Each structure stands twice: as C-alpha cells, then as structure tokens.
Regions:
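A short amphipathic helical element positioned immediately N-terminal to and/or at the very start
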Residues: 46-57, 313, 317-323
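Membrane-interface segments at the starts/ends of alpha-helical transmembrane spans
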Residues: 54-64, 136-139, 232-242, 322-333, ...
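Short cytosolic juxtamembrane segments of multi-pass membrane proteins
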Residues: 270-282, 437, 530-538
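Solenoid-repeat scaffolds in large eukaryotic assemblies
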Residues: 242-243, 441, 509-510
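Membrane-water interface segments at the C-terminal ends of transmembrane alpha-helices
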Residues: 4-41, 57-167, 195-215, 247-262, ...
Length: 538
C-alpha cells in the first residue's frame, strides 16, 4: 500500500511538472535573448535582435501598455457596474419577469467576445440595421468598442459571484439594518457591498484575466492590447524576439494578479455569524420600481445575448453554406478535436484529483493542483508562443521535427489551457465524498485501484461528464491557440468564423458562429440547472 501510494505521489508530481513545462518556455527565450547580448560569436544575429528590440521599445511597447490599461480598466468598471447592480436586484427584490431575466443574464457567457464583436459591427455598420433605422452609425473600431464588447460579455462572472454572496451572506446584518431603518441605498453601500466584496473581488480578477487573455475582439476591432500585439509582432512583423518579450511581460503581470488574489484571500477574512443554508428573503418593489428594475435587467440581457443571438440566426438563415460540404468537414474536425482534448483532459484531471486526495499531504496536494491549474491563468496567445518556442528549442537539440506534428502540440496546449476547468469541476464532486468512505473501502479491500474504479468513479460519473462537457465547449470556442498552433490546412469553427468576419463576410461567419453559440448555450443552461439543484438541496 505504501509503495503504491509512493508511485501515485511521484506520478502526480511529474505529471504536474510536465504540464507546466511549456508555460515557462517563453522565459527560456528571454534568457536566450539576454545571453545573445553578451555573445560576440554571432554578430549578425545580435544586430538583428537589437534592431527588432529597438523598434519594439521605441514605437510599439508604450502603445501596447496604453491600450491594454485603457481596455482593462474600462472592462473592469463596466463589468462591475452591470454585474453587481443586476446581481443585487436579482438577490434582493421580486419584480416583473425576474425569474426569466435571472436566467437570461447568465447567457452572454455562451457567446465568445470575438463573435459578439463582429455581430455589433455588422449591426452598427453603414449598411447595418442601426444606420438604416436611425440614420447614423456607432464606430466600434476603438477602445470604447472593445470595452463594450468585453464588458457585456464578461459581466456574468461578477454577476454569478455577487448574486450568490448577496443571497446568503450577512443575513443578520441585513436584519439589523432594516430595524435601524436604513435606506435601500445605505443597505446596499454599507451592508451588501461589505459582505460580498470578497466574492466581487474574485469575480473582478477573473474578468481582468479574461480581458488580458482576449485576442479575437481586440484584434478584430483594431486595438493593440498585449494579446493582439503578440500576434501582430509574430505574424505581421515577423519579430519573434519582441513577441516573446511581450508574452513574458504579460505572464509576469498575470502571475502578479494571481499573487494579489492569493494574498487577499489569505489576509482578508470576514466572518458573519450565520447559517449559510439560509437565503435573504426577497422584497417586493412598488409598481414603478418593478418596471424600472425589469427594464434595466432586460436591456443588459438584450445587449449581451438576445440581440446578438437573433442577428446570428438571421444571418445564418441567409447563408447558403449550410448546404456546402466544407461547413460539415470543419464542424466534424472541430468536434473530433474537442472530443479528444476533453477526454484526455478529464482523465488527467481525475488522476490528479484522486492522487492529491489519497496522498493526504496538504503541501503536495496544493502543489499538484496549483501547478496543474496554472495553464488557465496564462493568456492563450502567450501560451501558444511559449509552446512554439519550447518545441523549436527541442527540435534544435534532438532533431525530432516535433513541429511537424503540430496537431498533437495543439491538443497538448488545449490540455494545459483547460485542465484547471476540469479540476474545478471534479473538485465539487470530491467535496461531497466523505473521507470515511475511502477509509472504509481501504479497510475492506486494501487497493487504490478498487477505490478508484469501484468506489470513486460511480460516485463521480456526473462530475466527470460535467468536466468533459466544459472542456469540450471551451475547446470549440478557443481562438488564439487554434490560430497559432493548428497545422496548415486544418481549420476549426472559431478560426473560420474569425477569418470570415475579418474579410467582412458577415453572412459566411454567422453559421460557424451560431453553431459555437448553440453548443455553448446548452452547457450554460445545464450548469445553471445544476447550480439551482444544489441551492435547493442546501
């Protein structure tokens, strides 16, 4: 038993380290660039590096920083306003159509930001519906366009975190505030925000990391954020050195955000003496206020999901590519790729979760899960460049021509990127299996394999399926990794939709986009249903 446990421990740690290796490939490239400055054996390469870096820092670097800061701050503010306000209304008040709107407000998660971007450009363009009806157009090809698209796409993260906190935390504080006859505004600012600020902070950090990772919306709307800049340097300017530096800076910034999150969660604890299974009783608003609350939430849902979805369906019906073989070939390729990725990722996540559970060492368990989950925190563009840098380095050393098998590398990158999603999905299932179950099983039949296959797997089957579905959909939606690492001639739905939109072929882009949205929509609705069942049980 002890010998077997040792194998699980070693295997899990080696797997976690192996999965994090490509993430640090970019830092190896940075050290190589630094080394070349002190190497006099290859003057031509040194001159090329210095020329590229000089152009990068003189003309591009400050613009990338400026655009990234403007977009990040703008998206964060817009997401906070929309997410917190709508969450507070849903958690505390009864008003017209609130149950329907509560579901609609999470549905923007089903539409990737890059799809939302070209839908709004199509609506607001000179030949679009908005210009024909109102006689003027709104220009989306600027910072404001990116902020609107990302803000309306990402606010559900804050909405979900905040709504749960508003519903269940600081019930006693709410009751005391009512007894003291606090106004609704004062209850919101003095009680609700205070009790939910930890949850709001977590949602805001997630929005910030998703903003930094975004490539499609920023690139399509012509704003040079870090992720869009990485592509611009790598493909348009053929400057791998500057692209590596920008990727490294972006990774360092993300690590800083992760540290801030860790520090905040460990240093700021707020204790409210309450029964967490209780929820705040909703209050009924006056007739006028009900109309205003309903209208406000409907406008958010309209802009974030209803309007874009209707337009995608309308454009999709006008497109005759539904009857062309190419659409089905690309769809089949994408689904098979997503299926393979989801299957491998789910199995690896299951092994890591099982190993961290039976090791019974908090330090090793934390190391295994944190290292394995690191890939999700890294922007996809930076991860893609890091993968190329690493495998080019391995090709030079071992002469394996690994880049010739770039489809395998693409799947490997997907696994690194989405392993955290699978781990978090399985974590919820393992939290429901009591440790006494493991001890009883091992006492009766001292075998970890029996525990794994006969005990945990039947209990975890629904969570394994959930993890599989989430990774499957994330893979279909992924754009930057697919653009960077997909082999020549191999296209996914996301890449095809982006290329059509970039060529201003909106009707052609609608069909692959609609398929992505419909698949994502099924998962979002299903996950919301599972969450509601858990709330009822609690």
């Amino acid at each position: 038993m002890l010998k077997t446990l040792k194998y699980y421990k070693i295997g899990a740690i080696l797997l976690a380290l192996f999965l994090t290796l490509p993430i640090f490939g970019i830092f190896a490239e940075l050290f190589y660039i630094l080394f070349q400055n002190f190497n006099t054996s290859n003057l031509a390469e040194i001159s090329s590096i210095k020329e590229n870096l000089s152009h990068f820092f003189d003309y591009l670097f400050l613009k990338f920083i400026k655009d990234t800061l403007i977009v990040s701050i703008g998206v964060l503010l817009l997401s906070l306003i929309l997410g917190v306000s709508s969450a507070y209304l849903m958690a505390n008040y009864n008003f017209y159509f609130c149950r329907i709107l509560e579901k609609l407000l999470i549905l923007p998660l089903a539409i990737p930001a890059y799809i939302l971007a070209f839908v709004y450009v199509g609506i607001m363009d000179f030949q679009g519906f908005f210009h024909e009806v109102f006689g003027f157009r709104i220009d989306f090809f600027n910072h404001y366009g990116v902020i609107f698209v990302l803000g309306i796409s990402l606010y559900p993260y804050i909405y979900l975190f905040a709504k749960t906190a508003f519903k269940s935390e600081a019930i006693e504080a709410y009751e005391v505030a009512k007894i003291m006859k606090y106004s609704e505004f004062r209850i919101f600012t003095r009680v609700a925000l205070l009790s939910a600020r930890s949850a709001i902070f977590s949602g805001a950090l997630l929005v910030l990391m998703e903003t930094l990772s975004d490539y499609g919306a920023s690139a399509y709307l012509g704003v040079d954020t870090f992720s869009a800049g990485i592509f611009k340097l790598w493909y348009d300017l053929n400057d791998s050195y500057s692209s590596s530096i920008l990727s490294g800076i972006l990774m360092i910034f993300v690590f800083l955000i992760m540290y801030i999150d860790y520090y905040y969660k460990n240093k700021h604890h707020y204790s409210f003496n309450q029964n967490l299974t209780l929820f705040i009783k909703k209050r009924k608003l006056s007739h006028i206020k009900q109309i205003l609350a309903c209208f406000y939430c409907f406008i958010i849902a309209l802009l974030g999901f209803i309007l874009p979805f209707i337009w995608l369906v309308y454009w999709g019906l006008k497109d005759f590519k539904l009857f062309e073989a190419e659409f089905y070939i690309i769809s089949f390729q994408t689904i098979i790729l997503a299926f393979i990725t989801a299957l491998i990722t789910t199995l690896l996540a299951y092994f890591l979760m099982f190993s961290s559970r039976i090791i019974k060492n908090n330090f090793f368990s934390l190391c295994i899960l944190k290292l394995s989950s690191l890939g999700y925190s890294i922007p996809a563009a930076a991860l893609g460049i890091s993968m190329i840098v690493l495998f080019v380095f391995l090709d030079k050393i071992f002469h394996l021509n690994l880049l010739g098998t770039s489809l395998i590398i693409l799947v490997f990158a997907y696994i690194i990127r989405f392993l955290a999603s699978a781990i978090y999905s399985l974590e919820g299932g393992y939290n429901k299996i009591h440790l006494n179950t493991d001890e009883a099983s091992l006492n009766l039949r001292p075998s970890y394999l029996i525990l794994f296959f006969k005990i945990h797997t039947p209990l975890m089957k629904h969570f394994l399926f959930l993890a599989f579905i989430i990774v499957f959909i994330d893979t279909i939606k992924e754009l930057p990794l697919s653009r960077i690492l997909a082999p020549f001639g191999f296209e996914t739905l996301s890449v095809k939709a982006f290329w059509f939109a970039s060529d201003e072929r909106i009707y052609d882009a609608a069909l692959p986009s609609l398929l992505i949205v419909l698949l994502s929509l099924i998962v979002v609705i299903w996950m919301d249903k599972i969450t509601r069942k858990d709330d009822v049980r609690n």
